[in-house]
Amino acid sequence: MRLWTFSDDKKEFDRNKNLINGNLKTVLDDKKISEALIKNSVEKLAGNKRVYILSDHSDIRKQYSTALENLGKVRDLNGNIINGNTVLGSVILDESKQDITLSNITVFSNREKNFVTVKELKDYEDNKIEDDTRIAEIKAAIDDDNYINMRNTLEKHLQDQSTALKKKNPNISICHVHDRGEDSIEYLEFIKDTLGDDTVVRAKKSRNSTQYNINPTTKRKNYIKLIDSKFENKSEYHIDKLTLKGKLYQQVKVSIQWDKLILNNYDYSVVKITLFKRDGTTIYKEPMLLITTINVTSKVIAKEIYHTYLLRVKIEGVFKFLKDVLGWEEFQVRDWESIKNIIAICFFIGGYFYEIKSELTKNETIIMICDLAKSKGKITHYFFLEGMRALLTALRVDLFRKERNISDELYTKMQAYAGIGVEF
């Protein structure tokens, strides 16, 4: 999102910038946007018996930027460390698992002075940090109770949503869905004890099971990886056609196993899923492991846990829409407040387009706008925005012609430079 494209001149640019950089007493900031998103999701969804909160981190990559305030480190698509910042976003699905509502946004950087990793916090408590400046920064953040890290940011982000929904409807049931990286015991206990909610989270393949072998020499227990352990229950079912990352697989066999898992004296369920091609080879190198607070006692429930996790594709689709269509990573401001606020505003605007999704296929005007983008009959957020872009471009051209009093003859000559109307 480029502020300059919303401004006719530098004065208007400065006014727009002041609106989001914190210089005004009343400012549109990321916290206000977060509150508005949560309020909207509560009003819309609190009447449901059960909702699914899908949360994930998304890296805002600024590989070639160097002068941005609080420019942190993130990973590119190949896993390399590059410059950028981090966004934690959430969407909520209603009980039908169809309707998407963008529900919360948190923007932070691991270069902020008050960003203190869990390890760094422990080192501070154990007097292992030697940098006096950093010691002072951590102390100030702790004294002010405003230090942040990946763990407490996630906990606050989820608690704000869970508390708001239950305040409106104390009987609502909430299930949180997460990818790998959020399967720690601390996270599971936070969901179970503090929030009183359910969760389905993908487990890292490095996690140990409670099964073990005894080393005959040392007599020590060698715990078996969860992914390699034996599961008490097993079943399978078949899918005639399955499309994964654009590739079609036919006659797929799904092997699904489930068992109990005790972590820190708490009972959880774990589900292992393996997909087989019709020739008997696996589609993925490793099985998928899911940990859940839900008591899995049958194939039906195990299958439901798997399908619940697969809902994550919906938030991935939201992130892709924000980056590819709304230009989430294209901001051109440097101060941290403006960066946070523009990212949050973009998320909020994305929420609007998901709100009107049901209207896109019904409104004749919207259908025509999509056709303008050569949608070939497809009515989507992408083609709607591309059509709007074409309309706005045409409007700018018309206004320009009127302002400069450009004749049809001169306009035809201008078009010729763009190859319009030229025969080859």
Locate predicted features:
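Short runs of predominantly hydrophobic/aromatic residues within well-ordered alpha helices
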Residues: 287, 302, 315, 341-345
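Short amphipathic alpha-helical "interface-anchor" segments enriched in bulky aromatics
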Residues: 304-332
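Generic structural signal for hydrophobic core residues of well-folded globular domains
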Residues: 4-7, 94, 294, 309-312, ...
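Basic, amphipathic alpha-helical segments enriched in Lys/Arg and hydrophobic/aromatic residues
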Residues: 332-358
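Conserved, well-structured functional cores that handle cations and Mg-NTP chemistry
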Residues: 1-303, 374-424
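Conserved nucleotidyltransferase catalytic core and NTase-mimicking acidic/glycine-rich helix/loop elements
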Residues: 350-386
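Intrinsically disordered or highly flexible coil/loop and linker segments, enriched in small
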Residues: 9, 314-319, 331, 354-362, ...
